[in-house]
Structure formats: structure tokens, C-alpha cells
């Protein structure tokens, strides 16, 4: 479709009307360029897909929404805007689209959040109820849904009242009532525990109400994980050919795709035996009480028992072999170099893939049959079986995918990382097997790039080391296929608005010198706090361990520090805003996640402290396998993996400072390697152009470190 004169006029008119809605609107050349580039791509005038880096201040959200809505209307398609996190998704849904509705009154839009963000009305009713009959019913359905105390029951009753009177839409993030994680776990549900159309509350369920709204909406705000799942199952979203897709925070897409394709499952022998026994009993109950018209051969008891016995013996053999690779009787991990399994293990995985897929198919067949049963049956008993079969289906789906992936030598032209872990839980050792592909470009090509005609990939940061090459390698986007890559200029004058400070540290932030380095950092930070020059500050760390050691050095300043983990992030930010508004000093302290999506302007943030260059962890099975693979191709892992990742992280961290034309301040980076190592100049060259200062550092006094046993974490 060509961009007609009428379409161009419509986009221009909306853009002009928008300027009147936003106080102190500043017209920006990069924004006009982005609107034009997005329009040309979505209309099919230029290229296949567009990757466009739009630095902070460009106004990228409105720059893709205006042309996106205009072209979607012209072509009678649905515009899907996908983000990487709930916060940005909610901002677009609750702020940006309502703003556009003022100039496009008939605009229809909705948001599609993951199932786990919505309340389950069945669970809410049970937790809000004071009637024992409700609890008895749910106990029969195998659900543990009882309020812990009267206060919790009253809270749930208030939530139910808000839901019933349409004061609340059922989203966790859209209520002021405090809901802790334990309560929300019981209030929400997952695919395996949802009765779907068989549920009494189906028509009023917030999750399914939203899913129905998608069919009528012109704009759907989703997230990357949901989009990937929808493209895989061809559900939730309209047909790919009838979509215009914008992937905001597009730099997260390869990681989200990899996470979606990562498979892990418990394979502990007693646990597996129990699951198989439960499934055979479940099938027997279905055959006895809700016998299907056509009996699948595998449901015949003798055949099913033999099938499960073979599966059990294979799992037992797998346990025996894997345990040989790990020290006995303790937590351990073993990774297979280059993802290559010994022939004996490979044969077991291939057979497991076939056997678990057959059980998955059987569970799906019974579930479909149970879902079609009429009201002439015992509805409570039927619902209990549906829930149990749904959970069995979920288990066998994961197992089938896991063993299929384990059987592959490569995925997207790269090895599949494969490893086993032994973990202790409640005094018992459990064995797990994990698989994840290093590259996901083939999957993205199949699900997105080849399926949807035109896609916009955008973010404030898409490049690392001034290059799109890392994005291209990880995503599979390429100029040869007609994809375009555009980097817009920043509208800010960084040279005048701020500066980079690299203190003259005595120590590099290596593991050997970590304690001395953090002591120096704490001394310089204390000096900055005592200067009282800055109200709002942010301190970013590459690891939780380093953050905790830093806090040990500044215990006397703890009251002004708002530390990640103390409270939910949005509450920390709210408190930070209130403090600064009252003229108090406030310091946010966090990890890399605080370097993204944190929009604090002016005095709210005028000094950013960065602990060190954030290279990716080198102990992750995925990173190690990728390094082995790159070396086998005579490529240098530091250049391909570590440095681009570090550059990307540093750009995001530094980007917290200048968020508007009125912002000012300093970025303090406690890492002299930026000036002493050859790669340091390349990292600095990829940052906005700031003047650089190198002040002296007061001597840090090293504290004695208390010996503490660090908790074991699962590595990926």
C-alpha cells in the first residue's frame, strides 16, 4: 500500500492536534523523522521491517502510535504494540492511548496482559467468602483456597466488591489495595488450573473479557512473551497477516524468545513415578465415569501401563547416568560441553521425546472430550477431572518439548545448551534437566519476521559499540532481507547538561580487589552526599553481593537510601519523589533493572553512580556454551559476547541522567578501566558526548568481612 496524500494529511493533522494537547510541547526533528520512517515501513513503501533507535526525548511511543493507527485503519488491520515489561505496557495503555483518544474520539484499544496479572473470580469468591461450603467445594477441586486470617478475608471481600461494581478491572497493578505475593498466588491462576469455558465465572472473568475485547480493538497493548506465545499457538491475537506490530523495548526480544524456548523439568525418580501413577489413575477414572465415544488405543490399561513403565525405566536410567557426572549426595551441576550428549543419553532423550509426546496427545484428547461434556453429568466431579487433566497436559507438554530440544544438536545454527542440576528442597535431593538454545533467530524468523508483513523494532537503546551488529546476530534481522536500521539523534545537548566523572581509583573492580574497590567507592560516595549538591541520586551495581558490601560501608546513611528489595520498585520511586519534592536528599540503590524504565527528571535525579562496567556473568551455562561455540568458529567471545553486552548496559545506565531539556548533573563511573584498557575508549565513544573529569578519591578504609554462606542460586 502506498502512503496516499490523504493518509499523510491524516497523520500530519493528528500530530498537530497532539501538540495542542501537550503543555510545553517542543517540536523535534528526530520525532518527525521517526513518524515518517514508521509510516513508510508499515505502509510497505520502504523495506521489510524497521529497527529504529530513538533516544530518550524523541517521544518514540507517540511517534509510532500516530502513523500506526492511521495505517491500521486504512488497511483494516490491528495495531499490536508489544513491550518487555508491565510498567511500560501499563503506561501506554493508561497514559499514551487515552491522550490520543482526545484527538481520535472513536479510538478503540485494550491491553492483553499475561493470565497471571489478572485475578481469578472463582478464587477471589472463595477467599472473600465466610461460608464453609465454598471452602469444602474448592477442597474437593484440589484447591487450597482459604484466607489466612480475618483481615485477609476482609481485604478479598473489598476486592470482590470493587470487581463486582466495575471499580476494578481485575489487574493486580490497578488496585490500591495491598496484595502480597502469597495472597496473589492464591487469587490468580495459571493455564493448568483454569477451567476456561467450563468455569461458572467465564463470562465475567477479567482475563477472558479482555481476550474478547481484542477482537474489537484497533490497538492492542501486549508484551513480548504473550506475542511469542500467540504466534506459536495462533491464538489470542488476530491472524499475523492482519497485524501491524511494534516491538517497543525491542532489545529484549531475543532474550524473551530464548526464555520462552528454555525448557526445564524435574526428573527425580520417586517424583516421576508418582506423576505417572497419578496419570494412569486419572485416565482410569475418565474411562469409568466419563468414557469417551472413541477410545484411544493408548488408554487401554495394559497398553498405558506398559507405556508408562518404559518411560519410568528410561527416567531411572537417565538419573543413574547423570548422577555419575556429579558428586554424590549434595547439590551440584553438570553442563555438557558444546551441548553434546553422549550417544547413550541422546538415545534416551530421543525415546523420551516420543513417549512423552504420546502421553501429551492422550491428555489433550481426554481434556477436549471432558470439556465437551454436557450438564447431565456431575459438574463438580467433571470440573475436578478437567483441572487434574489440564495439569497433566501441562506437565507432558513441557516434558515433550524438553526431550525434543535435548535431542537436537543445533537450533538456529548454534548448539543447544544442556545441563543437569541437583537441588536440595526440604531435606530431599531433586534432579532437574535443562535445555535452552543459544540463538533464536530461526524461531523469530518463523514466528515473526516471515509471518507478519511489517514490524517496527524500537528502543532508546538498540546499538552497542555504535553498531547494530549484535542485534542483527541475536534477532536474525538483516539488511539482505530488506530490513532497515536507523539511529536517530538525541534532542538533548549532553555536553552542556552534564558530565562524566571517572574518579582516580587506586583499584580495579576485579574479584581480587573487590573489597578495596568498594571501600574507595563508598568513601567517594560519602563525599558527594556530604557536599549536599544533589537531592536525587541513583547508585547502580552489577551484582547483589557488591551492593550489599557497599551498604555495609554506609550504614550511617541507610535512612536516606532506598534499596532494591526493601519494597516494590514503584513504591521506592514514589517515596523518592516525595522526599525530593520536600527538599530532602534521597538515594535509590539497585541493580541493572534500575537502569531501565526509570524516568526521573530534573532534581529527582542529578547524580548517577555506576559501580563498574557490567560485563555479563561468565558462570552461566548458556554463556559458557556460547563461548565454546564461538571459539570453535575462531571468533573471540569477549568481542562478540562480553563487550557488546557491557556497552549496552553502560549506555542504559548513563541514560538515566538526561531525560529532558531541563535535566542536569553527573554520571560517576567507578571503573578506571574506561581510561586504562584499550576497550575503554570504545565503551566511552558509544556514550553521549559528555565532558570527562577525573577527581581524586579519599582513601577507603577496608572493613573486615563477616563470613556468610551465600544462598545457592539457579544459574542460566
From Swiss-Prot:
Binding-site positions, [4Fe-4S] cluster: 120, 194, 199, 205
Helicase ATP-binding domain location: 17-294
Reactions accelerated catalytically: Couples ATP hydrolysis with the unwinding of duplex DNA at the replication fork by translocating in the 5'-3' direction. This creates two antiparallel DNA single strands (ssDNA). The leading ssDNA polymer is the template for DNA polymerase III holoenzyme which synthesizes a continuous strand; ATP + H2O = ADP + phosphate + H(+)
The keyword tRNA-binding is annotated on this UniProt entry: no
Signal peptide: none
Record: residues binding ATP: 54-61
Residue ranges annotated as motif DEAH box: 131-134, 248-251
GO biological process assignments: DNA repair; SOS response
Entries under SUPFAM superfamilies matching the protein: P-loop containing nucleoside triphosphate hydrolases (SSF52540)
Domain Helicase C-terminal: 487-698
GO terms, molecular function: 4 iron, 4 sulfur cluster binding; 5'-3' DNA helicase activity; ATP binding; ATP hydrolysis activity; DNA binding; DNA/RNA helicase activity; metal ion binding
Coiled coil: none
Cofactor note: Binds 1 [4Fe-4S] cluster.
UniProt family annotation: Belongs to the helicase family. DinG subfamily. Type 1 sub-subfamily.
Purpose of the protein: DNA-dependent ATPase and 5'-3' DNA helicase. Unwinds D-loops, R-loops, forked DNA and G-quadruplex DNA.
UniProt protein name: ATP-dependent DNA helicase DinG
Origin species: Shigella flexneri
Amino acid at each position: 500500500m502506498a502512503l496516499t496524500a490523504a493518509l499523510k494529511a491524516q497523520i500530519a493533522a493528528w500530530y498537530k492536534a497532539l501538540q495542542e494537547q501537550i503543555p510545553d510541547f517542543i517540536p523535534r526533528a528526530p520525532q518527525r523523522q521517526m513518524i515518517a520512517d514508521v509510516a513508510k515501513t508499515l505502509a510497505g513503501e520502504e523495506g521489510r521491517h524497521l529497527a529504529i533507535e530513538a533516544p530518550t526525548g524523541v517521544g518514540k511511543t507517540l511517534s509510532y502510535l500516530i502513523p500506526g493507527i492511521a495505517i491500521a485503519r486504512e488497511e483494516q488491520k490491528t495495531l499490536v504494540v508489544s513491550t518487555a515489561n508491565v510498567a511500560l505496557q501499563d503506561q501506554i495503555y493508561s497514559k499514551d492511548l487515552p491522550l490520543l483518544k482526545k484527538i481520535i474520539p472513536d479510538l478503540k484499544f485494550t491491553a492483553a496482559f499475561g493470565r497471571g496479572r489478572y485475578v481469578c473470580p472463582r478464587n477471589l469468591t472463595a477467599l472473600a467468602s465466610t461460608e464453609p461450603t465454598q471452602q469444602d467445594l474448592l477442597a474437593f477441586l484440589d484447591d487450597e483456597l482459604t484466607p489466612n486470617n480475618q483481615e485477609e478475608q476482609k481485604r478479598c471481600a473489598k476486592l470482590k466488591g470493587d470487581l463486582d461494581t466495575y471499580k476494578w478491572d481485575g489487574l493486580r497493578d490497578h488496585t490500591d489495595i495491598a496484595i502480597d505475593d502469597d495472597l496473589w498466588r492464591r487469587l490468580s491462576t495459571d493455564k493448568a488450573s483454569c477451567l476456561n469455558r467450563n468455569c461458572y465465572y467465564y463470562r465475567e472473568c477479567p482475563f477472558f473479557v479482555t481476550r474478547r475485547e481484542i477482537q474489537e480493538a484497533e490497538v492492542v497493548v501486549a508484551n513480548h512473551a504473550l506475542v511469542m506465545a500467540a504466534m506459536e499457538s495462533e491464538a489470542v491475537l488476530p491472524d499475523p497477516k492482519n497485524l501491524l506490530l511494534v516491538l517497543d523495548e525491542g532489545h529484549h526480544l531475543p532474550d524473551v524468545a530464548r526464555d520462552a524456548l528454555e525448557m526445564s523439568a524435574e526428573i527425580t525418580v520417586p517424583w516421576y513415578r508418582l506423576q505417572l501413577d497419578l496419570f494412569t489413575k486419572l485416565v482410569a477414572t475418565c474411562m469409568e465415569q466419563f468414557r469417551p465415544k472413541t477410545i484411544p488405543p493408548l488408554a487401554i490399561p495394559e497398553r498405558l501401563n506398559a507405556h508408562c513403565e518404559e518411560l519410568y525405566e528410561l527416567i531411572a536410567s537417565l538419573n543413574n547416568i547423570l548422577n555419575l557426572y556429579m558428586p554424590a549426595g549434595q547439590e551440584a551441576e553438570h553442563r555438557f560441553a558444546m551441548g553434546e550428549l553422549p550417544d547413550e543419553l541422546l538415545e534416551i532423550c530421543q525415546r523420551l521425546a516420543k513417549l512423552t509426546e504420546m502421553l501429551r496427545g492422550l491428555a489433550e484428547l481426554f481434556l477436549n472430550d471432558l470439556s465437551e461434556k454436557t450438564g447431565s453429568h456431575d459438574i463438580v466431579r467433571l470440573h475436578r477431572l478437567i483441572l487434574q487433566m489440564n495439569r497433566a497436559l501441562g506437565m507432558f507438554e513441557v516434558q515433550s518439548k524438553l526431550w525434543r530440544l535435548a535431542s537436537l544438536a543445533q537450533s538456529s545454527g548454534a548448539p543447544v545448551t544442556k545441563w543437569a542440576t541437583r537441588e536440595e528442597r526440604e531435606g530431599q535431593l531433586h534432579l532437574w534437566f535443562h535445555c535452552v538454545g543459544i540463538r533464536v533467530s530461526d524461531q523469530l524468523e518463523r514466528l515473526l519476521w516471515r509471518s507478519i508483513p511489517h514490524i517496527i523494532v524500537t528502543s532508546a537503546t538498540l546499538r552497542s559499540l555504535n553498531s547494530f551488529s549484535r542485534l542483527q546476530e541475536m534477532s536474525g534481522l538483516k539488511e539482505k532481507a530488506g530490513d532497515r536500521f536507523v539511529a536517530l539523534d538525541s534532542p538533548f545537548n549532553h555536553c552542556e547538561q552534564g558530565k562524566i566523572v571517572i574518579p582516580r581509583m587506586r583499584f580495579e573492580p576485579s574479584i581480587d580487589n573487590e573489597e578495596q574497590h568498594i571501600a574507595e567507592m563508598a568513601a567517594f560516595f560519602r563525599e558527594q552526599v556530604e557536599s549536599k549538591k544533589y537531592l536525587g541520586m541513583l547508585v547502580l551495581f552489577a551484582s547483589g553481593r557488591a551492593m550489599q558490601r557497599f551498604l555495609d560501608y554506609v550504614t550511617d546513611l541507610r535512612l536516606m537510601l532506598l534499596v532494591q528489595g526493601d519494597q516494590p520498585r514503584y513504591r521506592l520511586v514514589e517515596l523518592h519523589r516525595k522526599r525530593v519534592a520536600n527538599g530532602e536528599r534521597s538515594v535509590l540503590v539497585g541493580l541493572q533493572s534500575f537502569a531501565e524504565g526509570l524516568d526521573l527528571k530534573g532534581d529527582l535525579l542529578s547524580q548517577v553512580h555506576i559501580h563498574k562496567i557490567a560485563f555479563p556473568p561468565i558462570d552461566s551455562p548458556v554463556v559458557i556454551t556460547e563461548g565454546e561455540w564461538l571459539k570453535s568458529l575462531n571468533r573471540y567471545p569477549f568481542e562478540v559476547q562480553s563487550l557488546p553486552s557491557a556497552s549496552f548496559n553502560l549506555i542504559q545506565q548513563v541514560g538515566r541522567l538526561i531525560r529532558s531539556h531541563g535535566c542536569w548533573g553527573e554520571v560517576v563511573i567507578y571503573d578506571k578501566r574506561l581510561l586504562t584498557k584499550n576497550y575503554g575508549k570504545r565503551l566511552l565513544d558509544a556514550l553521549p558526548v559528555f565532558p570527562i573529569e577525573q577527581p581524586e578519591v579519599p582513601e577507603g578504609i577496608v572493613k573486615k568481612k563477616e563470613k556468610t554462606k551465600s544462598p545457592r542460586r539457579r544459574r542460566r
